[in-house]
Amino acid sequence: MSDMEIRIRPVGVVRSPFKTRSDAPAQGRFSSEESEIHIFPEYLDAVDGLELFSHIFVLYWLHLAERNVLRVVPRGKRKKRGVFSTRAPARPNPVGLCLVELLECGEILRVRGLDALDGSPVIDIKPYYEDIDSLGF
């Protein structure tokens, strides 16, 4: 099974003020910066109805991340752990997930709180449903 290959085509691209990893916040929810997600023309029909939501999940490819790293020292810690137990961008399949506020909807989505670097390919977008996505903490 380890020789299985998956192909994913981006549905859009991030345009953000963050050009390098050091520019980006540790977590998007701690940022008030606005970014844009430019949806590719062939996927514009998929945006229909998204305007009904105040928040969305953005799945994106961490295109500048290292992919050969399996253990890292998490931020603020001293001991290495496996990347699956961290939020580190370096990982075998560097997929980013960020819950953002949707400010404007169209062929360009304007969002607040996205931690993706400028030029990051967007893999998917999903609406946030408070009743199923929140654990109520």
From Swiss-Prot:
InterPro entries: TrmO-like_N (IPR023370), UPF0066_cons_site (IPR023368), YaeB-like (IPR040372), YaeB-like_sf (IPR036413), YaeB_N_sf (IPR036414). Gene3D superfamilies: YaeB-like. Residues 8-137 form the TsaA-like domain. Coiled coil: none annotated. S-adenosyl-L-methionine binds at residues 25-27, 63-64, 87, 97, 117-120. Keywords: S-adenosyl-L-methionine. It comes from the Archaea. Belongs to the tRNA methyltransferase O family. This is Probable S-adenosyl-L-methionine-binding protein MTH_1797.
